[in-house]
Amino acid sequence: ALLVGSMLITLLRHADRVKIACLAQLVNVIAPIMTSDTGAWRQTIFYPYMHASVYGRGTVLNTQVLTPVYESKTYGEAPYLDSVCIWDEENDALTIFAVNKSLDEDMEVSCDLRQFERCRLAEHIVLTNDDMKAVNTEADPNHVTPTHSDATKLENGKMHTVLGKHSWNVIRLTK
């Protein structure tokens, strides 16, 4: 789910150039929704797709992110925090998608949102599991599902939160 979340964040960040993208995972081997003769269940990758589809509408904001980095074997330095902000003018809503890619540490995040001072915190959705290889199955279809976090605080246009280690996050502010 973290890889899919980061991929979607990258697509959204480049929405000025990427006008269409295709999802190859529409067959049952690695589909977001799996089926069998007796039922259907959502894979963990379903949730970032759903969140991006529902809340990733509007204008992608040009944000400046200062984040710790790690050294990748192939591409040099890579950020631990992957994020994008979307302003949905039609619904007066700001959505922040964020992935904490750290395997070991939660991440404190602060955002200057004074331009959106009239907004209030609507919700902070988190998808994570202590076992990074955890999956949903037909026998246990809700093993990894989104939960709500109360770690996010919004005060005087400043947002402070903690993103759990290896987590997908959706933070929504509305008027």
Segment roles from a protein language model:
Residues 1-83, 89-92:
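Aromatic/acidic polysaccharide-binding cleft in carbohydrate-active enzymes
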Residues 21, 49, 96, 124, ...:
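Conserved, mostly hydrophobic/aromatic
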Residues 22-25, 37, 64-65, 98-102, ...:
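Active-site proximal loops enriched in glycine and acidic residues that flank catalytic Cys/His/Asp
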Residues 78-118, 124, 169:
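Carbohydrate-binding surface patches
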Residues 98, 158-161:
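Beta-strand-rich interaction surfaces with strong enrichment in secreted/lumenal proteins
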Residues 104, 156-157, 165-166:
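Solvent-exposed, conformationally flexible loop/turn segments
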Residues 117-159:
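Acidic, Ser/Thr/Pro-rich beta/coil linker or hinge segments at domain junctions
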Residues 162-173:
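Short Pro-Gly-centered flexible turn/kink motifs
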